């Protein structure tokens, strides 16, 4: 049996920081059917930011071989990390929507709440679907850890295509698995086969490489614009997802290499889970108070949601949540 030594990847933490910034941006602004700058930015980050989290998780998991007892321990550990916050924050959000339902963006349907929560559908806190989906994919990866990640990536991608064309499942456990498992396992495959090549690439780590990635990024934004406003092709959508995740990864490696803004991205990466879990409530509070009750202009409270949704969770977590074992367990799964 093989055992993997736990490694810490600064590049992946930086990538997590960039991805969580995209989450906060995506939750701050409204999408638009016709092109606007803020509307495009919101739709743009949605092209790749959640797939990036699955990629990151798969990368960090890598390829591990476990005994039966180790599989059980790993599943219990993942349940504590993901499902404890999932159920706790579901209850918290349901109670808040019960008390302040008149201000809720998405009113709660209590008649189907239990079933919805158990199958990962229509959670009161929309962002919690990620925890549920990741847990299911984690279990699958743990149970089938004897199969290499490249093979699993290919197999899951075939299932993804079949689901997109034939099964068309989405919005609950089966749809989540079929939609994102291939990206998760792709992260493990990239770690094994590509990571060192990118990190040690003289071209990509040179000034010329930075210029190349900048030019490619501009072209990517143009492609994403077409995907958002012009075409509903699943092939284009898939290409935009893969390119976006890979670009984010390469940019993170370049940032780590040149230490450009590294401390900021590392800070956001270190508090990535905290921002994802707590930021929702900060942003919703601003939306209700400033948007619904006080009637602030959309741009005013939207920017407040972005700024405070990013900063407030760091302070709340550092000085309150992480200092309390129970809160840390219930909210962060630590």
Give the ranges of each region predicted by the language model.
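Alpha-helical transmembrane segments and their immediate juxtamembrane cytosolic regions
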Residues: 1-334
